[in-house]
Amino acid sequence: MSHEPTDAELKQLIDRWIAQWNEPEAERRRRLIREVWSEDGHQVLVNPPEGIRDTAAAYGLPFPAVEVRGHDAMYQRVTRAYEMFVASGEFVFEQEGEVIRHAGAAVALTWVMRSRRDGSVAGSGLEVLAFDADGRVRSDHEYVA
């Protein structure tokens, strides 16, 4: 069973979803992940970086989707992204544009990784989120540009 959030619930959830990627305090980041994600929630990076694709192809493997599942794995994923992009103070993740609702308690949102120095966009992505009965993210399919 899925939960279709109200507009207020959706705004709060998306704000916390973005906040987890920018949160400098490890325990607060872990708490945000538990609030945002269902216990068995998963994120699938649909279009992994070229290096991952090339390595898989070299072994004769099909194009791999990269997936993390559960709070502990998600904490590692979010923490690594924070360390790589945000911790230095160079970038911040922000929602860009409007959230688009889809039938069946799913939404799509666009985010950007913005330079704190000059405001330019250094990266972006599209997330398609589906929710569990408690209104937490059950699945996230991420497309990174």
Model-derived segments and their meaning:
Residues 1-145:
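C-terminal and inter-domain tail/linker signature
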